[in-house]
Amino acid sequence: DDFTPEGNHRWNTNKYYKKIGNVAEVISKIGKDVTPLGPSILGVCEIENRLVLEDLVKHELIASKHYKIVHQEGHDRRGIDCALLYDPLHFKVLAYKSIELTMPDNPDFASRDQLLVSGELMGELIHLIVVHWPSRRGGESKSRPKRIQAAKLTKSIVDSLQKQNPKAKVVVMGDFNDDPISPSMKDFMNAHDNNKD
């Protein structure tokens, strides 16, 4: 692993806390031009474990938000997960689960789970899906089937929620590792531009 003392980045305690500080600083500035409260919900990716999140939410730059954490260990071989940080004054978690991404033609495939969190945002039911789709490692076209499979999983989660309630409010957030015009987004997530001139 690159982020260990023996790894390529020669990771150590000082670098770790510097990174925590940098991320906390960015979070502390999000949305400040709109509201002094900052974000009520925040989907995060590349999470190694819950301790990292606990260190992050305790950082002095964001500790006053009293962020709570939704995190479950997933199936990624490197131990990299998705998580949700939320302000308990604005968001109440009702249920959550991690949903494994599989490849039918590759039983050994392991990637980040998709995190589904259902809750009340300012009293209104909302469903949040935090994703970190497979990277483009090995080239965009070679890795495309993995992102398409991730898109199919995300879409199936959305469809399931909207089957239960056609007016369900669903937000998908995270790192898609793809472009808005990529097949995973256009053809499988059915994303399109509603802002046509």
Predicted regions and their residues:
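Active-site His/acidic residue clusters
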Residues: 2-3, 124, 129-143
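Active-site flanking residues adjacent to catalytic metal/cofactor-binding acidic residues
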Residues: 45, 131, 174-175
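Structured beta-strand-rich core segments of catalytic domains in phosphoester-bond hydrolases
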Residues: 47-127, 133
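Loop/turn elements at helix/coil->beta-strand transitions in domains of secreted/extracellular proteins
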Residues: 37-41, 64-67, 122-126, 165-170, ...
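A Trp-anchored, charged/polar loop motif used as the substrate-binding/catalytic surface
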Residues: 21-27, 108-118, 152-159
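Flexible glycine/proline-enriched surface loops and loop-helix/loop-strand junctions
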Residues: 7-8, 113, 136-139
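Metal-dependent phosphoesterases centered on the DNase I-like endonuclease/exonuclease/phosphatase
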Residues: 147-197
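N-terminal, active-site-proximal structural segment of metallo-dependent hydrolase catalytic domains
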Residues: 1-66, 70-80, 151-152
